[in-house]
Amino acid sequence: MADITQQMNNLSVEQGSQGNGSSRSQYVPPHLRNRPSGGNGSFGGNRRGGFNNNSFGGFDNNRRGGYNNNSFGGYNNNRRGGFNNARGSGRYNTPKPGVGRWVDGKHEPAEKNERLEKELYGIDEEPTTQSSGINFDNYDDIPVEASGEGVPEPITAFTAPPLDPLLVENVKLSRFTKPTPVQKYSVPIVAAGRDLMACAQTGSGKTGGFLFPVLSESYMNGPAEVPETAGAFSSHKVYPTALVMAPTRELVSQIFDEAKKFAYRSWVRPSVVYGGADIGGQIRNLERGCDLLVATPGRLKDLLERGRVSLASIKYLVLDEADRMLDMGFEPQIRHIVQECDMPGVEDRQTLMFSATFPKEIQFLARDFLKEYIFLSVGRVGSTSENITQKILYVEDEEKKSVLLDLLSANDNGLTIIFTETKRMADNLADFLYDQGFPATAIHGDRSQYEREKALAAFKTGTAPILVATAVAARGLDIPNVSHIVNYDLPSDIDDYVHRIGRTGRAGNIGIATAFFNRNNKNIVKGLVDLLTEANQEIPDFLNKIARESAFGGKSMRGGSSRGGRGGATRDFRKQGGSYGGGASSSNWGGSSSSGGGWGSSNNGGYSGYSGRSNGSSSYGNPSASNSWW
């Protein structure tokens, strides 16, 4: 890593290209399969047909609607229906490899299966396996602020109790050695029956922060009862106990993959649904078993309207990357799912919201969906990790390709993600790198789900160690061993920059982030300088000069506060004098806050309406100190 940094420090725009394509493996990305090879690779096949082999984790090249990743551990059982047989003995009575049962109020874990364990957890030293990084212990020094009444004491290790013994075993198999700060607090908070709104820096273990406690409590308490009012067609409908909503197909697939690891040998069967893939195949997968459902809002709304999913048994609702979902316009679907369908009300479920940033608008949303929640802020939320070495290079647009080749030639190890602003540039840049002998692939919104999954599989396994991506991969994706991020095109929003470079330096590992900056990026210069200062990074002279020029011009160059400014993204809104029905005390935990009254006219432009469920039940935002099902 020191060698890479040294070579980067010596870079200049005048240096020539050092492609050295002859020394690299000849890989042909999916979108170039129809091009004549020209001596640059031996792979053939159809341009849009994916890889001509079946080596990528069981992907089926003959399916255009995405691979069958709902079959737990790769097993494709043919179980149909029968979801209502959980009311007494034996939920999912037919034993399956790696799948336990809930029988007569007791959890019966399945026997261990070596083949499944190898498939789920991989082998040490494999490129797809990431262990705790060398700086993981530094997380112990990250400040944590928890506000709310009666915050439970954090845990210090993965032990049983408070966690279920089976979950502890699965966590060890996944090579997690100690909880991150967000996990230390989320486990006891969920165990205490409390709602949670958590902010944590990118790469700090937010996925485990909700999967660990939700699965652990599910193992100990069992599935929810299916409503007795289920109709004649209920055998075709699934009744999950937990629902996780996230904004993108890639993120829900990633959460599902993690859920499979931690649900191994348990009664809980994870499933995933998302748009862009064959809905018929997803329905068939749901019918094989669904206790924990991971979904994008649009596809879930579709399945609810088709009568294939019921939320009547939901105990746990998780909203991951909530700010991103609002940015993408999912708020109407989310409100419909939570407030207008058959999901239990706010008093009868536990709700957890996780994200790297929580501006005021998201905290407003929390007043409808959460009750007497605990607000958890871990580290510099909305900032960058000091595990990431940030380098800002001044590069004019016409010189970017040459400088990029120098960077890639200097960094022969690890995985590299290159971010562009447009889909066309992503394709063009991937083609250019391929022609220069660099095995690259690309993902963006115009690629089919099948092509995106193939590209990510090739990237994760190191077959194509360079991924050119638009913002579709910027949020939430947790790809092991990404050592270098290149912002070929800087975003116009500084928060997008934060999330992009957060793809490296994850779980305590060290990474490098390089950005190509020129005067076309003046709109984010102030925010960029602030971020570099916060993370104790070197600020180049040209950046300070342009920042001073921008400030002298009298214009705000904050660049990145699309949701009302980053300053409010780390603080509990209840402590800022918002329109809650009560103030917060000055105790260490921020005091308690009464959230009564729903939305009022003093919301400063906040949402109006949506104060209650359409079926006439009590309005959201009215707190209760108890959970009826705990």
From Swiss-Prot:
Compositionally biased spans, kind Polar residues: 1-14
Keyword list, A-Z: ATP-binding, Cytoplasm, Helicase, Hydrolase, Initiation factor, Nucleotide-binding, Protein biosynthesis, RNA-binding
Start and end residues of each Helicase ATP-binding domain: 187-376
One CC-aspect GO term: cytoplasmic stress granule
Motif (Q motif): 156-184
InterPro entries linked to this entry: DEAD/DEAH_box_helicase_dom, Ded1/Dbp1_DEADc, Helicase_ATP-bd, Helicase_C-like, P-loop_NTPase, RNA-helicase_DEAD-box_CS, RNA_helicase_DEAD_Q_motif
Localization annotation: Cytoplasm
Listed EC numbers: 3.6.4.13
EC primary class: hydrolase
Reaction it catalyzes: ATP + H2O = ADP + phosphate + H(+)
Signal sequence region: none
An annotated GO BP: regulatory ncRNA-mediated gene silencing
Pfam family, one: Helicase_C
List of residues binding ATP: A200, Q201, T202, G203, S204, G205, K206, T207
An example molecular function term from Gene Ontology annotations: G-quadruplex RNA binding
Main subcellular location: cytoplasm
Domain Helicase C-terminal positions: 387-547
Region Disordered, residue ranges: 1-49, 78-111, 554-630
Compositionally skewed regions (Low complexity) per UniProt: 15-26, 78-91, 601-630
Family statement: Belongs to the DEAD box helicase family. DDX3/DED1 subfamily.
Record's function text: ATP-binding RNA helicase involved in translation initiation. Remodels RNA in response to ADP and ATP concentrations by facilitating disruption, but also formation of RNA duplexes.
Domain remark text: The Q motif is unique to and characteristic of the DEAD box family of RNA helicases and controls ATP binding and hydrolysis.
Name this protein carries in UniProt: ATP-dependent RNA helicase DED1
Higher taxonomy: Eukaryota, Fungi, Dikarya, Ascomycota, Saccharomycotina
